[in-house]
Amino acid sequence: MATIGLDKLFYSKITEGENGDETYAAPVALAKAMTAELSVELAEATLYADDGAAEVVKEFQSGTLTLGVDDIGKSVAEDLTGAVIDENGVLISASEDGGAPVAIGFRAKKANGKYRYFWLYRVIFGIPATNLTTKGESIEFSTPSIEGTVTRRNKVDGQGKHPWKAEVSEDDSGVSPAVITGWYDEVYEPSYADQTSDTGGEG
């Protein structure tokens, strides 16, 4: 189903343990979202047998998330891009800066008025792009965009896999209302009836 609106853009800072497993901080608002574009790159392998393709495996490799937002505040830019705020309150970006991984959550309104909710478990952003426009006869709003690389998380879920995205529609059958109402309280942690491993920690 097509989506027609985007809002409630949040991010969660990541702390990594010695083994690389992520612990997610409480989500905070990033900015007012206007657009989100997610492209995915798959790794593909083909097993040939009897002069034909016997099995084709396609696995998530990485993705690119491009967000169009109304404004990126200094503290958010510091968290997402590695820039620093100096003693005069000026945001300083250096060539040595590198963004720390974060989780990104948002929701998109569907054509039927219901929402689809998302968490991307590990995203590393670059420096935001800024568009400046001279004032002409008409008013033109110039808004920043920020691009990040999406990867799978290091921490395995209850089935021993490395998730990169969680999504749910509030009108999907079998979805608990508590999942929707608590979507931004913490980064969603997959839950399975047949848990095969102890993921441990906060998630």
Predicted regions and their residues:
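Short amphipathic beta-strand/extended segments with alternating polar/hydrophobic composition
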Residues: 23-29, 117-123, 160-169
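Surface-exposed beta-strand edges and their flanking turn/coil or helix-capping segments
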Residues: 39, 79-82, 117-119, 131-135, ...
